[in-house]
Amino acid sequence: MERFLGFRTPLGALGVVILLTLILSSCSVKTSYKEKGRVYNGKCPEYAKVWVHYCPTKYAYTDRYQHLSKVKIVNPRNGKSVKISLRLNKKVRGICLPKRLKKYLGKPFLGKVYLLRCGENGVKKCPKYIRGYASWYGGKFHGRKTASGIRFNQHEYYAAHRYLPFGTLLEVKNLKNGRKVIVKVVDRGPYVRGRHLDLSYAAAKKLGMIRDGVIPFEAKVLRCGY
């Protein structure tokens, strides 16, 4: 888990001003998705040499590729290979395969990794903006698993999109009232014709669209994928 280190400083007049600013800003920002970065190609190298080891898990994990990318891993020691989907886990170093594959592939090795598919659907680059109509979903889906594998929480600033890579951050603007919210793409949808984005209850409330149900929107891509 990430650790945050605190420190103490004498509180002078400047310190009080800074402290009040931090308190006020923390009250106005509910989401933890604050980072704003450039739009970039998702991490999907066509070929790479990566350290491959094993974990007592059902799935394969990596910190090197977009979530749900599919790769071919070759052990140069014995020529054996495996095709497998990878799940993103930033605590993992290299690629961690299910332990059941050790008998076939052999001891941990520096593997040759070939990209078969970037992410869930092959999207390597996000557009700078998306526009259309957004709807929202909440209680009925609260606690259910999303397409990305995490549990849907209607009180988080989440979104569903048909093809943007999971982990993508969007700054969504309600074109009816100008209100904005930053959301994270964790699910697929919407599948209703004429709709382009599904937002969680919390995000919809922030945008003031609960009563409207569907609103015209514009979204700026702050981060493409994880």
From Swiss-Prot:
Annotated compartments: Cell membrane
Described function: Lytic transglycosylase with a strong preference for naked glycan strands that lack stem peptides.
Can you locate the N-palmitoyl cysteine lipid attachment residues?
C27
What GO MF annotations does this protein's record show?
A: lytic endotransglycosylase activity
Q: Biological process GO annotation list?
A: cell wall organization; peptidoglycan metabolic process
* This protein's name: Probable endolytic peptidoglycan transglycosylase RlpA
Q: Name one GO cellular component term.
A: plasma membrane
Lipidation positions, renumbered (S-diacylglycerol cysteine): C27
Topology class, membrane: Lipid-anchor
**UniProt entry tagged with the keyword Cell inner membrane:** no
Keywords on this record?
Cell membrane, Cell wall biogenesis/degradation, Lipoprotein, Lyase, Membrane, Palmitate, Signal
Query: What family is this?
Result: Belongs to the RlpA family.
**Where is the signal peptide, in residue numbers?**
1-26
Principal EC category: lyase
What is the E.C. number? 4.2.2.-
